[in-house]
A protein has these predicted regions:
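Beta-propeller fold detector
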Residues: 2-8, 57-61, 99-107, 149-153, ...
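Short loop/turn segments immediately following the C-termini of beta-strands
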Residues: 41-43, 82-83, 93, 135, ...
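Anionic-ligand binding region
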Residues: 84-112, 117
Length: 201
């Protein structure tokens, strides 16, 4: 499948001129196809840059929201991590880009019986499944928020994942791994698509 090269984050920051408090604490940036973007800070605050108005706005977030983010392929949902928790938070997105209705939705597995391992980055595929870098490996969640598979690695916890086309690349313990999948990545800068429902089962 064809791969769209992601926008340069440094170019975006220089062009959009975020508030100083945001620029100095950026954790995750989700560039969108129209030049807008969601940006999280290390404290879990979420900001939205509107490419039409050139305005930065701080978004509503629930208590204890974390800095990791991913956007659903239809661009109608934004998912974030939750601090010291195995939950992920799902927000609805209004047409103007603002967030509302935040609630716990995805739940990750954890064999350590504590929540001291921070959730890593995450990305969706075109089927609406969410891939999350965790201490146990890459946890794959379905549309209903349930973990359906865990890809574990011999080197242990996953530090970061990269999903490009039909290949997933994994950084773990100073080593890099790759695996070809029977699905395709959908990153934030890709055009939104309709996703077939997996049902309630």
């Amino acid at each position: 499948p064809s791969v769209i090269v992601p926008p340069s984050i440094s170019d975006f920051i220089a062009r959009s001129r975020p508030p100083k408090s945001v620029k100095n604490s950026i954790h995750t940036t989700l560039p969108l196809p129209d030049g807008s973007a969601y940006v999280s800070t290390v404290d879990g605050d979420i900001w939205f840059y509107d490419s039409k108005t050139k305005i930065w706005s701080q978004m509503y977030t629930v208590e204890n929201g974390g800095p990791q983010m991913a956007i659903y392929p239809d661009h109608k949902l934004l998912v974030t991590s939750e601090k010291n928790s195995d939950w992920l938070i799902s927000y609805l997105i209004k047409p103007d880009g603002t967030l509302y209705g935040g609630q716990r939705f995805y739940w990750l597995h954890n064999t350590s019986n504590h929540s001291q391992h921070p959730t890593g980055n995450m990305v969706f595929d075109t089927d609406g499944n969410l891939y999350v870098a965790t201490y146990m490996g890459i946890q794959i969640c379905d549309q209903n928020g349930r973990v359906r598979a865990i890809l574990s690695l011999p080197s242990g916890p996953v530090d970061r994942l990269y999903f490009i086309g039909d290949q997933i690349f994994i950084e773990s313990g100073g080593r890099f791994y790759s695996r070809k999948l029977h699905t395709t990545a959908h990153n934030s800068w890709d055009e939104p698509i309709e996703v077939k429902s997996q049902g309630q089962g």
